[in-house]
Each structure stands twice: as C-alpha cells, then as structure tokens.
Amino acid sequence: MKIVLASANKGKIKEFERLLPNDEIVAFSEILGKIEIDEDKDTFKGNAIKKAQTIYDELQKINFGDVVVISDDSGISVPVLGNAPGVYSARYAGLNASDKENNEKLKAELNKLGLEKTPAFYTACIAIVYKNEVYTVHGWMYGEVLNKEIGTNGFGYDPMFIPNGYDKTLGELDEGVKKEFSHRSKALKLAMKVLEVIL
C-alpha cells in the first residue's frame, strides 16, 4: 500500500520507513511540492489531523486516487515548565528554529530553575485519513530531560532525554533500541491495527 506521509521532516520520514518497512512511504512533497501547513492547534491531535486532512484534500484535487495519508504531531513536555515545549517543540526557540536552537532554549529554561534533570515525557499522535475518514492514535514515552546533550543519534531533543529504565539518552542509544519503545513506535503499532481494519 502506498502511504503518503504528511511531513517534510527527514528524521520523521526515516523513522516511519524503519517502522513500516513493507509499505511504500512517500513524502507529500514528492507529489505536491512545497505546502506550508500552519500548525496552529493547541493539541498534538489537532495538529496531526490538520496536517493529514490538508494533504489528503490536496491529493484529491489532483485525482491521486486511493491513498492513505498519515501524519503525526509529537513533542516533549516538561511538567515543571507547565508541559512546555509541548505542541511548540519544533519551534520552541522560534519559527524555523534548528534542533540545536530548540535544545539550547530548553537547557536555558532548565538552568533558570537550577535543574540538571527533571521528569519529562514525549507524546506522539498519529492521524490517518483514508476515504475521507479520520482516525487517531497516541503513544507516550516517559523519562527525564537533562540540561545537557549527550550522544548524536536521533534528532530533536533525543540527546537530552533519558527514557525510563535506561541510563543513556536517546542520543546514545542505538536506533533499533529506540524503535522498541519510542512514543512514535507505540503510536505506529496502534496505527497498524487501525490500517488492518480499514484497508
């Protein structure tokens, strides 16, 4: 089955390809070119649905045919910071901020509170649009966020996050290990069950 991913984030695309090796994953930009989608909802679910529905609607305009569009919205939440960055994780340091800039901002916020580490959790919401029906699933990963980066694997806040049950950051852990328990892989396992039912 061809699955169109409503994301231009190369890190996310690679992760979806690893988690769904038997499906043809195509980034929407390969078909539609550049489309800016304003992630203006205040929940991960709202943003995921908006992205998937927007891309699905654009594909219908060009008569792309039977297609599954999958989108995710995800981020890290730090309770001591009022669950920030939350839905603003990708733009915590500003619109078009790099991973490095976002990490620096989070470190600065933790340092203001004198925290070397504190509880945090990742949330992933996956939205699936097929035959104009919308389905959503969630996955979570709990652990601690550090005020420093360790390791170079992964993307985003991975080098700052130690998942529960581990003594290394996601930036230090092998991608195969992360695949077993990440918020996105948990959500994708549920998404696979949805796809089995609807396809």
Swiss-Prot record:
The record lists Mg(2+) as bound by D38, D73
Which segments does the entry list as coiled coil?
A: none
Q: Which domain of life is it from?
A: Bacteria
One GO molecular-function annotation for this sequence?
A: ribonucleoside triphosphate phosphatase activity
Asked whether the keyword Disulfide bond is assigned, the reply is: no
Q: How does it assemble?
A: Homodimer.
- What reaction does this enzyme carry out catalytically? XTP + H2O = XMP + diphosphate + H(+); dITP + H2O = dIMP + diphosphate + H(+); ITP + H2O = IMP + diphosphate + H(+)
Q: What is this protein called?
A: dITP/XTP pyrophosphatase
The record's free-text note on cofactor binding: Binds 1 Mg(2+) ion per subunit.
Which keywords fit this entry according to its UniProt record? Hydrolase, Magnesium, Metal-binding, Nucleotide metabolism, Nucleotide-binding
Q: Write down the HAMAP family for this protein, in alphabetical order.
A: Non_canon_purine_NTPase
Role = Pyrophosphatase that catalyzes the hydrolysis of nucleoside triphosphates to their monophosphate derivatives, with a high preference for the non-canonical purine nucleotides XTP (xanthosine triphosphate), dITP (deoxyinosine triphosphate) and ITP. Seems to function as a house-cleaning enzyme that removes non-canonical purine nucleotides from the nucleotide pool, thus preventing their incorporation into DNA/RNA and avoiding chromosomal lesions.
Q: Which Gene Ontology cellular component terms are annotated? A: cytosol
Q: Does the keyword Ligase apply?
A: no
Belongs to which family? Belongs to the HAM1 NTPase family.
Q: Which GO terms describe its biological process?
A: nucleotide metabolic process; purine nucleoside triphosphate catabolic process
Q: Where is the signal peptide?
A: none
Alphabetical list of PANTHER family matching this protein:
INOSINE TRIPHOSPHATE PYROPHOSPHATASE, INOSINE TRIPHOSPHATE PYROPHOSPHATASE/HAM1 PROTEIN
User: According to the UniProt entry, what is the EC number of this protein?
Assistant: 3.6.1.66
Binding of substrate occurs at: S7, A8, N9, K10, G11, K12, S74, F155, G156, Y157, D158, K178, H183, R184
Question: Which SUPFAM superfamilies has this protein been placed in?
Answer: ITPase-like (SSF52972)
**So which cofactors does this thing need?**
Mg(2+)
Where in the sequence is the active site?
A: D73
